[in-house]
Amino acid sequence: PFPPYPLPNPAGFYELQLKGAGTTPYSRFADGRAVLRSSVREFVASEAMHSLGVPTTRALSLALTGDRSVVRDQFYDGRARLEPGAVVCRVSPCFVRFGSFELPAAREDPALARKLLDFVVEKHYPHLAAASFAPSNRSPGLPLLLEVAERTGRTVAAWQACGFVHGVLNTVRRTGFSVRFSIFF
């Protein structure tokens, strides 16, 4: 079927990410917390995708926070209630997403965008760095875009092959493999 991307990682390192650990600079206006219900869904979905050979992040662990103080409106019908808190530890070779490049673009900061691009290429796509020195291609931006677009296409094809439908396809959920399973069908 499909290669078990992103694990194992040929670069030899992995990134960890905590879902539900609390407020961070990236929490936007939310509280940065997660409930058990969505955390179990995240864990099960990522492991199911992996078992089906679909490119995905993996869930390394799932833990309860020990409190019932996370307020969520499960059906968005105005009836929020307290739910048990949880934390999922995700593992992946890379958590940079399409949306990661939106911040420097919104700030109109090309230097920051270039710094992020150089970091991503150096750490996650080193084979593109050598190709970028050709006179006709001074930036690895286009080769990176093409490779990630191809990887994303293969991932979406793998979803379709197993009948998976991701419920939210925004830029913070696009990486070239499956990530963030908070809503799916």
Across the structure, where does each feature detected by a protein language model lie?
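Phosphate/ATP-binding catalytic cores across multiple sugar-kinase/actin-like superfamilies
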Residues: V148-C162
